Amino acid sequence: MDQDRSGAADAGNPDPGRGPAGSAEARNGAAAASSPAEWAGQLRLSVAERNGRSYAARQFHEGALRVLRPHYLDRSGQVTYTVVNPGGAYLGADAYLLDVAVERDASLVLTTQSATKVYRTPQGPATQDMTVRLGPGSCLEHVPDQLIVYRGGSYLQRTRVDMDPAASLLLAEVVTPGWSPSGESFAYDELRLRTEVRVTPPEVPAPAAPDRGAPAAEAQDRPADPCHVPGGPDRAASSGGTGAAPAGERARRLVVDQLRIRPDAHGGMSGVGFMEGFSHTGQLLVADARLDDELYERLCELVDASGTHSGITRAGTGEPYGVRCVCVRSLAHSTSAITALHRAVVDELRQRWRGQSPLRLRKY
């Protein structure tokens, strides 16, 4: 099981064409360039806030993905959406797209109706691409049911998050080995999960250009622009008149979290350095500017008391724009043990940051 949380490589090479949360460019997303015919299922959801209540401002689904009617778990105005796959499972070469935007001051809990199941994939790995954009003051708690990969299955999941420095992000995942006739715990071919989080501050327009009719003496009193190239274009004019850097140039990578499990390549998964006798693994990632030292110590206490084989670490490439990141990696003998730890962390953050009650999804 290979893990990489550093995300240091390519930190200065942001992807082009990525707009800030809430912009028309961002709403379309990078995946919009792909034809819908390429996806076995796709879901696009944009959540906005009005009068203290979050709601779906835009919603689109096609193929084997859709959402149930929204519901509100408490009086905070946070909306909960449940993703459904009517097909029941991911099969070989299936490709799924989720595109989620949580706009300014909106709050979303995103979950699934049941476990995500990946069966045999002889045609190639099943894939899921998820793109998330979080606006200023927004909140996303992504708490899906467990991921189960069965014998002969391969699964690749890529999650890309672009968040405002004032946004709050929580991503949870639990991986369970599927049943096999031989009784093997890890009979699938490969599992790869990659999560990347970038922080993009809002666009700040530059001061208005001076009146070109200003007296020459006044112009001479202005300090010289150290970045000005003689004979070159004015910076404000070259950036569309705003003087602000494009979103791609403002973005800073916070963290890349990777999990790769290839049972056959390692000759067994139960040894030291791999699953160490455990059957289930989980990861929880939190990104928020309010993750101070006192809260980190409290989260460490929750991890230590969980009864799982877990570790917690400060993750990321520094604190871009003041945003901090914490990652919890867990091993256990059951889904419920890891889920209980995740919920303990979720509930602690909900109460501290937003005064919300514990998360009770009311699925069953």
From Swiss-Prot:
Pfam name, any one: UreD
One MF term in GO for this entry?
nickel cation binding
Source species, domain of life: Bacteria
Q: Which GO terms describe its cellular component?
A: cytoplasm
* Subcellular locations according to the entry: Cytoplasm
Swiss-Prot/TrEMBL keywords? Chaperone, Cytoplasm, Nickel insertion
What does this protein's UniProt record list under function? Answer: Required for maturation of urease via the functional incorporation of the urease nickel metallocenter.
According to its UniProt record, which protein family does this protein belong to? Belongs to the UreD family.
Subunit info?
UreD, UreF and UreG form a complex that acts as a GTP-hydrolysis-dependent molecular chaperone, activating the urease apoprotein by helping to assemble the nickel containing metallocenter of UreC. The UreE protein probably delivers the nickel.
- Please state what the protein is called: Urease accessory protein UreD
Species the sequence originates in: Kocuria rhizophila (strain ATCC 9341 / DSM 348 / NBRC 103217 / DC2201)
